Amino acid sequence: MHIHMMNRDEHIAKKVEGSISSFSGETSTSSKQIYVNPVTTTGTKSMEDDDVSLSLLYNLSTLHEKVHQIQSLVSFYMVSTNNINQSSGSTSLAVANIGSLVQEIITAASSMLYTCQQLQIGSNNNNNDIDNDQTVDAMVLEFSRQETDPGHDFVQESTNLFGVQERGQISFPDQNLDWYNTETINPKKDKHRSKPSSGSYDILELDVADLLAKYTHYCQICGKGFKRDANLRMHMRAHGDEYKTREALISPTSQDKKGGYSLKKHYYSCPQHGCRWNQRHEKFQPLKSVICAKNHYKRSHCPKMYMCRRCSVKHFSVLSDLRTHEKHCGDIKWVCSCGTKFSRKDKLMSHVSLFLGHVPAHGSSKPPTITLK
């Protein structure tokens, strides 16, 4: 059975495009180490392993292809900047294409990360079930030895997902491939946060690819994408008079309320296992909308790709956060006598009220002057 699974993985790897030939060997080897289970293998499990293997290989092929495309565009951009006769339109188009490719790379990489994390969680659970009886017997045997040898400490050697041996107490820690930021919870604020009753709403959990997609709503006629449902309804007017009626332009939620239908409200769950906003968390708090779910996942579980050009310090994972920061970055309007600088007047006044002898510096209480050119 083990040899049969290895042959099937090799057959799946051959279906991938030739552009990832340099990576196929490592990928197929790692997939064998993760998915092939010589102890228990069922038909359903084999089908799931095939789907996961194809998903990983497809995402890897996408990453390899997009990286080569970015290399070509960057080379074109560098040549065009040195060429005086090159038009600015082609240069701006190349920059726009580079940004689009970066977003696709982030989507594929995040999808691979999420798949690996789910596989690690499932692998740990399977190991716990299989080795449960053996672990209990080992603990009983070791405790009996401790009665005759008090100086002996029971230590277990285990192998993690990457084949690295670890030593420690008997436990199966839930390890995560965390390369994102962690969030701190303020219990004083959470105590006053109201949570809707569980029977009054439905929980929807979108995939990582859907959360990182550029658009959420798509036209079923022409396929054009939109970020908001209202924009899609306005777009539908171009496809015929039947979409220009008042009923077609009203939100479906408003129609349900007006018609007396008692539909449950939809809330959303973060797909990241262990997150406070994941529905399997013991202190789960639902996200109110798709926009909230998308922004939460980007801010909490994605790398901060956008850097402020003014201060070169602040990094953001959501573009709108960068735009908000750039509005006041570098504009020092309020200064304390101690030399501390603030971008807002209320922050300065709070600082002055906390420290005795601190006063606003000369000229900081005046509103900034605006000069029109």
Swiss-Prot record:
Any one GO BP annotation for this protein:
response to acidic pH
Describe tissue expression.
Answer: Expressed at low levels in roots (e.g. root tips and lateral roots), leaves (e.g. at the edge of mature leaves, possibly in hydathodes, and in vascular bundles), flowers (e.g. floral filaments), stems, siliques and cotyledons.
Q: Which PROSITE patterns does its entry note?
A: ZINC_FINGER_C2H2_1, ZINC_FINGER_C2H2_2
- Which cysteines in this chain are paired by disulphide bridges? none
Q: Where are the zinc fingers (C2H2-type)?
A: 217-239, 327-362
Sorted alphabetically, which SUPFAM superfamilies does this protein's record hold? Answer: beta-beta-alpha zinc fingers
List cellular component terms (GO): nucleus
Molecular function (Gene Ontology), one example: zinc ion binding
Compartmental location: Nucleus
One Pfam short name: zf-C2H2_STOP2_3rd
Q: Does the keyword Electron transport apply?
A: no
| Keywords of this entry | Metal-binding, Nucleus, Repeat, Transcription, Transcription regulation, Zinc, Zinc-finger
Give a short account of what the protein does.
Probable transcription factor. Together with STOP1, plays a critical role in tolerance to major stress factors in acid soils such as proton H(+) and aluminum ion Al(3+). Required for the expression of genes in response to acidic stress (e.g. ALMT1 and MATE), and Al-activated citrate exudation.
Matching PANTHER family: PROTEIN SENSITIVE TO PROTON RHIZOTOXICITY 1, PROTEIN SENSITIVE TO PROTON RHIZOTOXICITY 2
Provide the protein name.
Answer: Protein SENSITIVE TO PROTON RHIZOTOXICITY 2
Q: Per the UniProt entry, what species is this protein from, by scientific name?
A: Arabidopsis thaliana
